[in-house]
């Protein structure tokens, strides 16, 4: 999804 989705999944 977004550029930070890989660590902002929560």
From Swiss-Prot:
GO cellular component: extracellular region
Disulfide bond residue pairs: none
Any Gene Ontology biological process: neuropeptide signaling pathway
Record bears the keyword Nucleotide-binding: no
Top-level taxonomic group: Eukaryota
Cleaved signal peptide residues: none
Keywords, ordered alphabetically: Amidation, Neuropeptide, Secreted
Similarity field: Belongs to the FARP (FMRFamide related peptide) family.
Record-given protein name: FMRFamide-like neuropeptide ALAGDHFFRF-amide
Organism of derivation: Mytilus edulis (Blue mussel)
């Amino acid at each position: 999804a977004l550029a930070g989705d890989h660590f902002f999944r929560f």
